Amino acid sequence: MKIYLVGGAVRDALLGLPVKDKDWVVVGATPQEMLDAGYQQVGRDFPVFLHPQTHEEYALARTERKSGSGYTGFTCYAAPDVTLEADLQRRDLTINALARDDDGQIIDPYHGRRDLEARLLRHVSPAFGEDPLRVLRVARFAARYAHLSFRIADETLTLMREMTAAGELEHLTPERVWKETENALTTRNPQVYFQVLRDCGALRVLFPEIDALFGVPAPAKWHPEIDTGVHTLMTLSMAAMLSPQLDVRFATLCHDVGKGLTPKNLWPRHHGHGPVGVKLVEQLCQRLRVPNDLRDLAKLVAAYHDLIHTFPILQPKTIVKLFDAIDAWRKPQRVEQIALTSEADVRGRTGFEASDYPQGRWLREAWQVAQAVPTKEVVEAGFKGIEIREELTKRRIAAVANWKEKRCPNPAS
């Protein structure tokens, strides 16, 4: 029995990055030998075991053979005669097909170290094309390592395009698509994930609402980048700089989806793209089974981001109505989230990356003023039932009006 550290732990150690999870491959052992050694079996489809002390995963060396469609259509063979090289060959990328033995020696049969040094994401073998999930995984790795200047090998991108054209991605379940997307959105450069999907044709299949934005013009005065799809990815990039929150990043991605369905004869203007966008966000989230809290914020951002940009001319009554609409009284975090997405929208434009966004500050300040109005005083004043809500709203509007006059006067007055 020989045990090797494999995959991401070896890759990240060679890159000088923190190693989070360790995966191990066991060569020359049977399931019974693993159980006798105190390991606990957890894999149903193939033999994976948990170490009795560290609880890290130890998998018996195995090979995989395509036996059906999609990413689940594989037959696994695990036995003591499966070599380490054979196990590594079934992996997606050469940089993930690395192993390290007890002496610290690197086993690299598919030239993963060479590709690490060249900053290349290259598939190990033609078997890559048998698993459509790998298209998303490569896009995610491209996003994860974009700051290290990694790029996808030409032949790998070609294979990804062929897989997409062959309809392989249609076999992916919504849950798997969302899981990869969720992980990609938390990387330093989430926009790269969507750009790679676009480059290989997968964006049109998996995110048609986003893909439809490319080629849609916007007024050059406000959007020097002109293309709404380009702006969307620039905005997502800015959101990633402003916030680590998945909610904020996803909502930013979806903020302009309505522009893909506005009347073409009115382009480059997109009147009413907010309400249209809300419906498309609902459609996208339902299809991919996006969690409700992410969906709800994305719908609010699609509906109200343009309103935030006009904050200096908003009436106090409109501002308080906005807080009602986003349910800020029960979910105060939404004020900050919407401020960040709106800022990302403004700064995610060519030449505006370093712009100040005072509207975000004013939104936060107005919220502090409105929510500081005490409900207790309204109740003590004798108001009852629905009167409490009406009086509270009236007092909040008055408080915001007083603040706005001093802090954020209407430019027209």
Curated annotation (Swiss-Prot):
<keyword id="KW-0547">Nucleotide-binding</keyword>
<comment type="subunit">
    <text>Monomer. Can also form homodimers and oligomers.</text>
</comment>
<dbReference type="GO" id="GO:0042245">
    <property type="term" value="P:RNA repair"/>
</dbReference>
<keyword id="KW-0808">Transferase</keyword>
<dbReference type="GO" id="GO:0000049">
    <property type="term" value="F:tRNA binding"/>
</dbReference>
<keyword id="KW-0533">Nickel</keyword>
<dbReference type="GO" id="GO:0016791">
    <property type="term" value="F:phosphatase activity"/>
</dbReference>
<dbReference type="GO" id="GO:0004112">
    <property type="term" value="F:cyclic-nucleotide phosphodiesterase activity"/>
</dbReference>
<keyword id="KW-0694">RNA-binding</keyword>
<feature type="binding site">
    <location>
        <position position="140"/>
    </location>
    <ligand>
        <name>ATP</name>
    </ligand>
</feature>
<dbReference type="InterPro" id="IPR002646">
    <property type="entry name" value="PolA_pol_head_dom"/>
</dbReference>
<dbReference type="Pfam" id="PF01743">
    <property type="entry name" value="PolyA_pol"/>
</dbReference>
<feature type="binding site">
    <location>
        <position position="137"/>
    </location>
    <ligand>
        <name>ATP</name>
    </ligand>
</feature>
<feature type="binding site">
    <location>
        <position position="8"/>
    </location>
    <ligand>
        <name>CTP</name>
    </ligand>
</feature>
<comment type="similarity">
    <text>Belongs to the tRNA nucleotidyltransferase/poly(A) polymerase family. Bacterial CCA-adding enzyme type 1 subfamily.</text>
</comment>
<keyword id="KW-0378">Hydrolase</keyword>
<keyword id="KW-0511">Multifunctional enzyme</keyword>
<dbReference type="Pfam" id="PF01966">
    <property type="entry name" value="HD"/>
</dbReference>
<keyword id="KW-0819">tRNA processing</keyword>
<feature type="binding site">
    <location>
        <position position="137"/>
    </location>
    <ligand>
        <name>CTP</name>
    </ligand>
</feature>
<keyword id="KW-0460">Magnesium</keyword>
<feature type="binding site">
    <location>
        <position position="91"/>
    </location>
    <ligand>
        <name>ATP</name>
    </ligand>
</feature>
<feature type="domain" description="HD">
    <location>
        <begin position="228"/>
        <end position="329"/>
    </location>
</feature>
<dbReference type="Pfam" id="PF12627">
    <property type="entry name" value="PolyA_pol_RNAbd"/>
</dbReference>
<dbReference type="InterPro" id="IPR043519">
    <property type="entry name" value="NT_sf"/>
</dbReference>
<keyword id="KW-0692">RNA repair</keyword>
<comment type="function">
    <text>Catalyzes the addition and repair of the essential 3'-terminal CCA sequence in tRNAs without using a nucleic acid template. Adds these three nucleotides in the order of C, C, and A to the tRNA nucleotide-73, using CTP and ATP as substrates and producing inorganic pyrophosphate. tRNA 3'-terminal CCA addition is required both for tRNA processing and repair. Also involved in tRNA surveillance by mediating tandem CCA addition to generate a CCACCA at the 3' terminus of unstable tRNAs. While stable tRNAs receive only 3'-terminal CCA, unstable tRNAs are marked with CCACCA and rapidly degraded.</text>
</comment>
<feature type="binding site">
    <location>
        <position position="11"/>
    </location>
    <ligand>
        <name>CTP</name>
    </ligand>
</feature>
<feature type="binding site">
    <location>
        <position position="91"/>
    </location>
    <ligand>
        <name>CTP</name>
    </ligand>
</feature>
<protein>
    <recommendedName>
        <fullName>Multifunctional CCA protein</fullName>
        <ecNumber>2.7.7.72</ecNumber>
        <ecNumber>3.1.3.-</ecNumber>
        <ecNumber>3.1.4.-</ecNumber>
    </recommendedName>
</protein>
<dbReference type="InterPro" id="IPR003607">
    <property type="entry name" value="HD/PDEase_dom"/>
</dbReference>
<dbReference type="InterPro" id="IPR050124">
    <property type="entry name" value="tRNA_CCA-adding_enzyme"/>
</dbReference>
<dbReference type="GO" id="GO:0004810">
    <property type="term" value="F:CCA tRNA nucleotidyltransferase activity"/>
</dbReference>
<feature type="binding site">
    <location>
        <position position="23"/>
    </location>
    <ligand>
        <name>Mg(2+)</name>
    </ligand>
</feature>
<dbReference type="GO" id="GO:0005524">
    <property type="term" value="F:ATP binding"/>
</dbReference>
<dbReference type="GO" id="GO:0000287">
    <property type="term" value="F:magnesium ion binding"/>
</dbReference>
<dbReference type="InterPro" id="IPR006674">
    <property type="entry name" value="HD_domain"/>
</dbReference>
<dbReference type="InterPro" id="IPR012006">
    <property type="entry name" value="CCA_bact"/>
</dbReference>
<feature type="binding site">
    <location>
        <position position="11"/>
    </location>
    <ligand>
        <name>ATP</name>
    </ligand>
</feature>
<feature type="binding site">
    <location>
        <position position="21"/>
    </location>
    <ligand>
        <name>Mg(2+)</name>
    </ligand>
</feature>
<feature type="binding site">
    <location>
        <position position="140"/>
    </location>
    <ligand>
        <name>CTP</name>
    </ligand>
</feature>
<dbReference type="GO" id="GO:0001680">
    <property type="term" value="P:tRNA 3'-terminal CCA addition"/>
</dbReference>
